[in-house]
Amino acid sequence: MPEISRDEVAHLAKLSRLALTDEELDRFAEQIDGIIGNVSAVQQVAAEGVEPMSHPHSIKTTMREDVVEQILTPEQALDQAPAVDQQRFVVPQILGEQD
């Protein structure tokens, strides 16, 4: 069974900008290890001769004509925005990184 280390979980948490306690690191390492084990078990299933599918039932897609209706101008769309720059919404920076 594959094993993911506590350090690997800590690395993933850091990349995801998550602050995890020692208990959470241990618990998530165990849970991720279980998930990887389940995926490995599924990969072992003999699927020769089975045609690939996206869904077990036949699904029909209903098509309709694409009709252009009245749309907003850029000015109308941005009219109520608190901050705009070059016809774009200005939002607060989330991750603290700069370009």
UniProtKB/Swiss-Prot annotation:
Top-level taxonomic group: Bacteria
- Which reaction is the catalytic activity of this chain? L-glutamyl-tRNA(Gln) + L-glutamine + ATP + H2O = L-glutaminyl-tRNA(Gln) + L-glutamate + ADP + phosphate + H(+); L-aspartyl-tRNA(Asn) + L-glutamine + ATP + H2O = L-asparaginyl-tRNA(Asn) + L-glutamate + ADP + phosphate + 2 H(+)
Q: Which GO terms describe its biological process?
A: glutaminyl-tRNAGln biosynthesis via transamidation; regulation of translational fidelity; translation
Keywords assigned by UniProt, alphabetized = ATP-binding, Ligase, Nucleotide-binding, Protein biosynthesis
Enzyme Commission number: 6.3.5.-
Q: Which GO terms describe its molecular function?
A: asparaginyl-tRNA synthase (glutamine-hydrolyzing) activity; ATP binding; glutaminyl-tRNA synthase (glutamine-hydrolyzing) activity
Q: What does this protein do?
A: Allows the formation of correctly charged Asn-tRNA(Asn) or Gln-tRNA(Gln) through the transamidation of misacylated Asp-tRNA(Asn) or Glu-tRNA(Gln) in organisms which lack either or both of asparaginyl-tRNA or glutaminyl-tRNA synthetases. The reaction takes place in the presence of glutamine and ATP through an activated phospho-Asp-tRNA(Asn) or phospho-Glu-tRNA(Gln).
Subunit structure comment from the entry: Heterotrimer of A, B and C subunits.
Homology family: Belongs to the GatC family.
The protein here is known as Aspartyl/glutamyl-tRNA(Asn/Gln) amidotransferase subunit C
Native source species? Corynebacterium diphtheriae (strain ATCC 700971 / NCTC 13129 / Biotype gravis)
